[in-house]
Amino acid sequence: MEQFEMIADNAENIYQLIHAESGRRLDPFDIVLQFKIKNRTEYVSADVDVKATAEDIASSGKSPNITSYARIRSEYVNDPDYIFIVLSLKHKVFSERFPETGMTNGVMEVVSYSVYDLKYISERDLSYNPALGTGQLQIRDIHYVDIVNRTAWEFCQMLDAKFIRSRGEDAWLKMATKYQWIKTD
């Protein structure tokens, strides 16, 4: 968070980042970034979900929960330009234990990172898990992700197909009605 704040505080930053803040406790993201649109007075926001994985644990980064199906689909219906970023931080832990106190002193070092726009994660790498409410989107392996350019509409169609394969078309219609995804005007 501090790194984003330092960049935003520099009015000359090359990213046009103007503001960074932490998400609230139950938000599906950890950080909100606001960028100025070049040569305009408008800005665009990006929600960032931070996923930390351990370098020395083989299963770390396998199928992390990203966000709920209904929540993310609703965001893209309301704003096709919505940006949801997954920031993957791979870390290594250095620690020592003090035998006299039993306390451990440790430091985490970020050894690599990857950044993905959720909308562009390939269909093969993004899975739907029906557990937990409306279901969770998961990345199969956060360290190896392919990117596919697509529109918000194509992204929603892919998510819907995954949901329907898992729960059926009747369940999708019920949810689409509840969240007002189907426009009747």
Regions found by a protein language model. Name each.
Residues 1-27, 35-46, 52-185:
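Nucleic-acid endonuclease domains
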Residues 31:
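Ligand/cofactor pocket segment of small-molecule handling proteins
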